[in-house]
């Protein structure tokens, strides 16, 4: 059973419980894509932009921040071999710079100072622990809180905008709980087509999203109790990384239950090792302690073997996903 829920995880379960299981329980990693790498780098550049003095926040400086961010990001293992050629990487970079040009055309970064950037938000609603990171929080000219999120993709039509605010509503709910102040507005900045969507916050809307996320949480708990995470066929299936191993589309889809069991056992062993590490002398443990019968060397050896088995299983599944 997971201990925390983020807005993105909640949305994922709502969209498709099977996808949620593949990603968060079976822990089948989705490789970083060029689109995701671009989003990460653009977000980093926009965050760093506000480290500069207002009169230095121009397009040229923002482009340089993008290049600096990518130099750091590309060294990560997950971005290794992301591009097949230098030319492909160059085109990718030029597209990233275009997104930043679009940002500069719809918002003037010299005219305000963000209240906070990349802010950790966490809190509890009944038995649910929620946490996540919001891109930016401002105060408008009325002194009211505004929560801002950057999107590197394209904005939907205005009449379809509200579902996209689900995560920001949750952040607003947690901010209200933490600070005792309700944000007045949510803002989504879509960089692909230079569009800003806003939504006024009301107490009714926060009460409603609280009901909605608790319903999702209760459904997650039921899914864990019954071990049933059904696949939900929808319009997003064609873009789902896990489609090749989804039983809806593949009658011979591999059973990932063993992965789930190994992951759960790895978590248990890790917790036991961490508990034993707290004691300099194991002999100090009382005889009736569950830890007294454990051998840390045996636990570490078992962990390594299970981790290798898990990696081999995931590798075979990843081969199917790449076909």
Predicted regions and their residues:
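Metal-dependent nuclease catalytic regions and adjoining charged, substrate-binding loops involved
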Residues: 4-5, 142, 174-282, 288
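Alpha-helical coiled-coil heptad-repeat register
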Residues: 263-277, 293, 300-303, 307, ...
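Mg2+/Mn2+-dependent nuclease catalytic core
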Residues: 112-115, 119-215
């Amino acid at each position: 059973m997971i201990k925390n829920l983020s807005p993105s995880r909640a949305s994922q379960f709502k969209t498709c419980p099977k996808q949620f299981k593949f990603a968060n329980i079976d822990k089948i990693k989705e490789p970083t894509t060029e689109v995701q790498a671009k989003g990460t780098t653009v977000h980093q550049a926009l965050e760093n932009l506000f480290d500069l003095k207002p009169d230095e926040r121009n397009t040229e400086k923002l482009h340089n921040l993008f290049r600096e961010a990518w130099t750091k990001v590309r060294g990560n293992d997950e971005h290794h071999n992301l591009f097949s050629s230098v030319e492909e990487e160059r085109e990718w970079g030029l597209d990233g710079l275009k997104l930043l040009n679009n940002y500069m055309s719809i918002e003037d970064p010299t005219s305000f100072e963000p209240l906070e950037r990349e802010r950790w938000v966490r809190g509890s609603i009944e038995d649910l622990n929620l946490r996540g990171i919001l891109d930016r929080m401002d105060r408008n000219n009325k002194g009211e809180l505004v929560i801002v999120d950057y999107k590197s993709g394209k904005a939907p039509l205005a009449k379809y905008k509200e579902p996209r605010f689900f995560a920001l509503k949750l952040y607003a709910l947690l901010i209200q709980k933490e600070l005792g102040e309700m944000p007045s507005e949510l803002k989504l900045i879509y960089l692909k087509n230079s569009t800003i969507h806003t939504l006024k916050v009301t107490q009714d809307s926060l009460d409603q999203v609280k009901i909605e996320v608790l319903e999702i949480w209760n459904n997650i708990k039921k899914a864990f109790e019954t071990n049933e995470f059904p696949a939900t066929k929808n319009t997003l299936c064609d873009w789902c990384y896990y489609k090749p191993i989804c039983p809806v589309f593949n009658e011979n889809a591999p059973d990932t239950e063993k992965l789930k069991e190994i992951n759960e056992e790895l978590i248990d062993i890790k917790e036991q090792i961490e508990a034993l590490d707290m004691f300099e002398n194991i002999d100090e443990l009382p005889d009736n302690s569950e830890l007294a019968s454990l051998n840390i060397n045996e636990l570490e050896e078992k962990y390594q073997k299970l981790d290798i088995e898990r990696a081999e299983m995931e590798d075979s599944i990843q081969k199917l996903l790449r076909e």
